[in-house]
């Protein structure tokens, strides 16, 4: 499916981010597993890939940013609060889907994720990435 990469884009680097999220209070296994599964570096410019797994918002073009991982994880954890491990939402609508990273994270907890984005260049980029 999606390549693991090497160095700063490897599965081991993603695991370090997951451990930092857990240290900051993200305890839902499904949320942490989504961060293990989705390579954040493919959603940002290659020049910034060495910073992809920092817990920071990063520019994605058109004056927009990819959200800080802790913010994304906190929102998804809240969505799953009091839900069983096998629970899936039927539909989730994400307004301002940007590069598609959060939509990819959400795809593990919903049957269908619909993203709305007003900036065409981001729509085009995220559509291509989500198909992978």
Where would I find each of the regions flagged by the language model?
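N-terminal auxiliary segments of SAM/dcSAM-dependent transferases
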Residues: 1-47
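Alpha-helix C-capping/helix-to-loop hinge sites
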Residues: 20-24, 60, 113
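Alpha-helix N-capping/helix-start residues
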Residues: 28-29, 69, 120
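Short, surface-exposed glycine/acidic/tryptophan-bearing loops
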Residues: 47-60
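Conserved alpha-helix/loop element of class I SAM-dependent methyltransferases that forms part
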Residues: 55, 66-89
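Conserved nucleotide-cofactor-binding alpha/beta core module
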Residues: 79-132
């Amino acid at each position: 499916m999606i390549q693991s990469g090497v160095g700063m884009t490897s599965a081991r680097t993603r695991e370090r981010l997951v451990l930092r999220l857990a240290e900051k209070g993200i305890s839902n296994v499904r949320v942490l597993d989504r961060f293990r599964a989705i390579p954040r570096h493919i959603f940002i410019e290659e020049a910034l890939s060495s910073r992809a797994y920092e817990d920071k918002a990063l520019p994605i073009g058109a004056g927009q940013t990819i959200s800080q991982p802790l913010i994304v994880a906190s929102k998804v954890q809240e969505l799953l609060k009091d839900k069983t491990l096998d629970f899936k939402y039927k539909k989730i609508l994400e307004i301002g889907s940007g590069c598609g990273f959060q939509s990819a994270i959400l795809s593990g907890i919903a049957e269908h994720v619909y993203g709305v984005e007003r900036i065409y260049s981001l729509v085009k980029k995220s559509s291509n990435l989500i198909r992978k």
